């Protein structure tokens, strides 16, 4: 594994109140299967990640001392075409804050909220 640059994100956690609802949303929008992680009393389900490759891993977390929603951090998920995932958001209980929009030479993004009110980004980078 290569040593990552110190300014890259190495892990993220999205705090949720209802894990079953959150898993349904994220697995449905992204067409993936989350994996259990850590002790059951914490309630963590992780997104797949490959160590040593571009991007980072993270997890949904349900913990009584950490409320969901209302923070100022946005996690952006890479998508081949963010309009595809954007169309799935309402089907799985989320809402669209800003539909697919250009961010110039950096591609396109959609801003959405999951069922717990967490703001997430769907990012389609421009490929050379």
Give the ranges of each region predicted by the language model:
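A solvent-exposed interaction/effector surface
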Residues: 28, 64-65
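Conserved beta-strand in the GNAT
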Residues: 58-61, 120-121
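Active-site/binding-pocket entry motifs
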Residues: 53, 65-67
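Structural motif
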Residues: 9, 55-58, 72-74, 107
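Vicinal oxygen chelate
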Residues: 1-10, 14, 35-38, 86-128
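Core segments of cupin and vicinal oxygen chelate
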Residues: 3-7, 13-55
């Amino acid at each position: 594994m290569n040593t990552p640059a110190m300014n890259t994100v190495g892990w993220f956690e999205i705090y949720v109140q209802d894990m079953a609802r959150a898993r349904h949303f994220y697995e449905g929008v992204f067409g993936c299967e989350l994996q259990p992680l850590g002790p059951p009393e914490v309630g963590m389900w992780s997104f797949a990640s490959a160590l040593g490759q571009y991007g980072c891993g993270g997890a949904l977390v349900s913990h009584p001392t950490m409320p969901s929603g209302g923070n100022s951090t946005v996690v952006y998920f890479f998508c081949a075409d963010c309009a595809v995932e954007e169309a799935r958001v309402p089907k799985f209980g989320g809402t669209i804050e800003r539909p697919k929009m250009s961010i110039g030479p950096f591609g396109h993004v959609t801003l959405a909220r999951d069922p717990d009110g967490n703001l997430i980004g769907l990012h389609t980078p421009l490929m050379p």
